[in-house]
Amino acid sequence: MGKAIVIIDFNNLFRGSIMNITQEQYKNLFTNVIEEILQKNENNISEILVRLYGGWYQGHNLTNMASDVQTKVQQIDLFPIIKDKKKYDGSIEVVSTQYGLSEIWYNTLQEKAGIPRLRIDEEHQDTGCEQRKEICPVHILQKFLQKKATICRNPGCKTEHSKVFYRREQKMVDTMMTCDIITYSAEEDVAALYIVSDDIDLFPGIAISKVKNNSIDMNLFVRTTQTKLAYQQILSTYNINIKSLEL
């Protein structure tokens, strides 16, 4: 009997602060995916491995977000599952190593000084501020963010763009998921692969994995109907099932 692998793009999936996601919401997500797996593959698998990907490390330190996710996930007891007198083992893991490697990929959540320059959509800008840009918040913000060295124009204020604004970015997470999708799909004992993500950067890797192993049951759960409609046709060409997932 084979395995079903579930790859969940955690930060991409949930909106707002991850810290506000409840344990019950996590459980509902896992349960919905597992039910889909068993409906299609109950006779092909005996084990389900759920892997959660995200920017879990800032430097070499586990982030507060990662600790919160780990704590809540560890309290969810779904396995083993008994259905029609058959037992399905499994696990749910917050992962920081890719399949086939033992090293942890650190520094997957990075802070960068400043915010990229904003562009104004002229079609949606009202003409009322055209002659008074100096008091229009849209133009003030756009001008302040033009360069990272920009200083506040208020007399006596020395606030600098790059010192007051910063952004956080995930690094390597998409690449790690793509590597795992390709690697897992090549394993003989993996009967089904389920990817839960709205990130279109993963789609080429999903497609080539299915081409290399057409026998694997490949499934993609996306958050938005818009993503589903935009990519359903091309993914169905490769016999990849795509559906919207209610959270």
Label every PLM stretch briefly.
Residues 120-247:
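Nuclease catalytic cores that cleave nucleic-acid phosphodiester bonds
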Residues 1-150, 161-167, 211-212, 221-223:
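Domain-level signal for Mg2+-assisted phosphodiester chemistry and nucleotide/NA-binding surfaces
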